[in-house]
Swiss-Prot record:
Entries under Pfam families matching the protein: Thymidylate_kin (PF02223)
Protein name according to UniProt: Thymidylate kinase
GO molecular function, one term: dTMP kinase activity
Keyword match GTP-binding: no
Protein family (similarity comment): Belongs to the thymidylate kinase family.
InterPro entries the record matches: P-loop_NTPase, Thymidylate_kin-like_dom, Thymidylate_kin_CS, Thymidylate_kinase
EC number: 2.7.4.9
Annotated GO CC locations: cytosol
Catalytically driven reaction(s): dTMP + ATP = dTDP + ADP
Binding sites annotated in the UniProt record for ATP: G10, L11, D12, G13, A14, G15, K16, S17
Enzyme class at the top of the EC tree: transferase
HAMAP family found in the cross-reference section: Thymidylate_kinase
Superkingdom of the organism of origin: Bacteria
Gene name of the encoded protein: tmk
Organism expressing this protein natively: Francisella tularensis subsp. holarctica (strain OSU18)
Length: 209
């Protein structure tokens, strides 16, 4: 079976880590090799850039365009050094976020032109598209409440409710426009989310239970 690139997307607090644990359980049950990674981050250099974007310790504002470019610098490292080589070796890749997050957070939330983000993806990632995107939809208020229970808010989580409303809108628009994307109501029970993920994997990849 050809290797697959699966991405889990959603607002902070949507339950992406839990969803990835379900994907891992499913792939392992079917004896399918996979690596599990995240963005921002995924490689040593990309993780350094992640820390700068999320926990800026300097007395200097990060411009929206600069934020986008730092994230994309990390994404290029991540894609070329980890994602692409794994897929070429026949290993599945499951990522917590990919370029959709830039479309939603930097495009929708920060107001960066979506055409700029698409250009970065086309020019530096060879227009890479995941085989499957599972988008976990959640009301921003509930998502932020969940995220705050996990730890102190990072720089982006402090952006405010309207920021996350704009971010959510772009996520939902992306789901409507792309055939390889499925939306799950992340406010439902963990058991229901798990069931939906398994059904999605069955449908898209014809894995055997």
């Amino acid at each position: 079976m050809q290797s697959k690139f699966i991405v889990i997307e959603g607002l902070d607090g949507a339950g992406k880590s839990t969803a990835i644990s379900f994907v891992r359980k499913y792939l392992e049950k079917n004896n399918l090799a996979a690596i599990y990674t995240r963005e921002p981050g995924g490689t040593k250099i990309a993780e350094e850039l992640r820390n700068l974007v999320l926990h800026n310790k300097y007395d200097e504002e990060i411009h929206s365009d600069s934020e986008l470019l730092m994230i994309y610098a990390g994404r290029v490292q991540h894609y070329r050094n980890l994602i692409a080589p794994a897929l070429e070796k026949g290993i599945n890749v499951v990522s917590d976020r990919f370029y959709w997050s830039s479309m939603a957070y930097q495009g929708g939330g920060r107001g960066v032109e979506l055409s700029k983000i698409r250009a970065l993806n086309n020019n530096f990632l060879n227009g890479c598209e995941p085989d499957l995107v599972i988008y976990l939809d959640i009301d921003p208020i509930l998502g932020l409440q969940r995220a705050q229970k996990v730890g102190s808010p990072d720089r982006i989580e402090k952006a405010g409710l309207e920021f996350f409303n704009r971010t959510r809108k772009v996520f939902k628009d992306l789901v409507k426009d792309l055939d390889n994307a499925i939306e799950i109501d992340a406010a439902k029970s963990i058991q229901e989310v798990e069931k939906q993920i398994y059904l999605i994997l069955d449908k898209h990849f014809n894995f055997q239970n």
